[in-house]
Structures are given as C-alpha cells and as structure tokens.
C-alpha cells in the first residue's frame, strides 16, 4: 500500500481455512457487555434477570434478520438480479437501524406475551443498546468501512488521533474521515447522559425515548459525512429515519405526559403484569 501504511489485519484468529474476524469478535464482545449491563440494571429495578436473557435469545437472531432485510430493501437494484446473495450475510450488508427496528418489535411482542411493561423493559436495556453500538462501530473500523469522505493526513493529525487510527483510515491511497469514531464517541457520550438523566425526574419510558432522540440526532449529522449511505431517491435513508424518530419520540414524551401520566422512572417498580398507563 502507498506511503508504506499497512492496515490492521481484519482477521483475529486463523485456523486452517477457518478465519475469525475482528468484526465478529468486537460485535460478540459488545453483546456480552450489553447483556451484563442490562442484567445489572434489571437487578437494580427488581426485574427477573431471566426476562433479559429470554429477550436476548429472541432479539439477537431477529435483529440480524431485520438488519439484513432493511439493507436488501434499499439495495434492491443489486439484489433483484442477484437473489442468491440475499442470504449471504457474511459478504456484508446489514444496517443498524434495521437491527434496532427488529429489536424494538421483538421487545413489544415479548412484553405482551410476558405481560410486562414494554416501557420498563425498554428503559432497562436503553443504556446497554447505546454502549453496544459504541463498541460495535470499532468492528467497522477493523473492516475499513462506514467511513466518511476523503480528507488529508494533516486533518486527521489535527484531531490528535492515535497513529493506528490515522493509518487505518488510509484506504487505497486515500485518507478518509473516521465517521465510525465520531459515532462511537457520540454514543459513549449518550451512555453517560443516560446514566445521569435516569436519576432525574423523568417518567417511565423516557430513558429509552431519550436514547432514541440522542442517537438519531447524532446519526443524522454523521450520516451526512458518510460515503456508503443507503439511498431512497435523492435522500439518505438513515437521515430521513433519524428525523422521523426524533419527532416521534418527542411526540410520545409529550403525549404520554399529557394523556397517560406515567410514573416517575425511579418510582416505577417493576411488576409482572404491566399496568395501563
């Protein structure tokens, strides 16, 4: 590679013809950390930990499938002529918003089946979701994907980035914006924010909705820097969805406060049967 810059090896473990990539290791680590955090949060909320484990068992495969379906829908011009590629998820092509949609739908159905409050469940897992996303973006870093537009080494050095990040952003002779890093840091800040505001006088469900608003706001601007956006005509799909989610979440907060009077988050004790609020 030009300039003598070598990218990091995306393969973590090589055993004969079997290779385990850093992307998979990082995503798996993110899931484990998210699970441990959610279990800890469930314990504080007096929630049965098995509920979190059971939800995860359903949410992981459904989220992967929905992330793939979401990606295929907006890349249909390619997949309609390559139908066999649809199931080849190992070739790449999943979308985080698709995964989140699948996870939320799973949680809604799961909470109804278990007769528990979706909002209580969503509040418990919200910090776990955003920290998992922060960690997961480093899988994109190892694959040299989800980057932004062309830039210069001088610009990256001006950000005071470690050398290994600058070198990894040198792809095919060109330096690119590390949008993976921008989103990862934004999510870390969001995680800290959620830990702070959960101690304030927010209502049940608003921790999760705050997560949606925070993530969507950052994603809207970061998506505008990326070069691999899924498109819907002339619009970036993730930007459109981000705006819709922000409006929907703010609307839900206002509506629930005016019409449903949900309990305060810190006072909303978990119960087996969800109350109508």
Swiss-Prot record:
GO process terms (BP): lipoprotein biosynthetic process
Record keywords: Cell membrane, Membrane, Transferase, Transmembrane, Transmembrane helix
UniProt binding sites for a 1,2-diacyl-sn-glycero-3-phospho-(1'-sn-glycerol): 137
Membrane topology of this protein: Multi-pass membrane protein
Subcellular location field: Cell membrane
Any single GO CC term annotated in Swiss-Prot or TrEMBL for this entry: plasma membrane
GO terms for MF: phosphatidylglycerol-prolipoprotein diacylglyceryl transferase activity
Pathway involvement of the protein, from the record: Protein modification; lipoprotein biosynthesis (diacylglyceryl transfer)
PANTHER family attached to this UniProt entry: PHOSPHATIDYLGLYCEROL--PROLIPOPROTEIN DIACYLGLYCERYL TRANSFERASE, PROLIPOPROTEIN DIACYLGLYCERYL TRANSFERASE
UniProt-listed NCBIfam families: lgt
Name of protein: Phosphatidylglycerol--prolipoprotein diacylglyceryl transferase
Species of provenance: Listeria welshimeri serovar 6b (strain ATCC 35897 / DSM 20650 / CCUG 15529 / CIP 8149 / NCTC 11857 / SLCC 5334 / V8)
Gene that encodes the chain: lgt
């Amino acid at each position: 590679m030009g300039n003598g810059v070598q990218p990091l090896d995306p393969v973590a473990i090589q055993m004969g013809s079997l290779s385990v990539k850093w992307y998979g290791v990082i995503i798996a680590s993110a899931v484990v950390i998210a699970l441990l955090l959610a279990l800890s949060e469930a314990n504080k909320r007096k929630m049965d930990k098995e509920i979190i484990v059971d939800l995860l068992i359903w949410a992981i495969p459904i989220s992967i499938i929905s992330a793939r379906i979401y990606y295929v829908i907006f890349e249909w011009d390619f997949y309609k002529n390559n139908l066999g590629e649809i199931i080849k998820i190992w070739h790449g092509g999943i979308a985080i918003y698709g995964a989140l949609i699948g996870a939320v739908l799973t949680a809604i159905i799961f909470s109804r089946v278990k007769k528990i409050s979706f909002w209580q469940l969503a509040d418990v897992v919200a910090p776990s979701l955003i920290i998992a996303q922060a960690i997961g973006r480093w899988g994109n870093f190892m694959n040299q994907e989800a980057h932004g537009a062309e830039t210069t080494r001088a610009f990256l050095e001006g950000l005071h980035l470690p050398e290994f990040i600058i070198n990894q952003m040198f792809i095919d002779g060109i330096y690119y914006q590390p949008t993976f890093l921008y989103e990862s840091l934004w999510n870390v800040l969001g995680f800290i924010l959620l830990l702070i505001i959960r101690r304030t006088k927010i209502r049940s469900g608003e921790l999760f909705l705050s997560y949606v608003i925070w993530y969507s706001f950052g994603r809207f601007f970061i998506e505008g820097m990326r070069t691999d956006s899924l498109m819907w005509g002339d619009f970036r799909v993730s930007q459109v969805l981000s705006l819709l989610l922000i409006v929907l979440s703010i609307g839900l907060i206002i509506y629930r406060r005016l019409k449903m009077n949900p309990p305060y988050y810190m006072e909303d004790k978990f119960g087996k049967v969800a109350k109508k609020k």
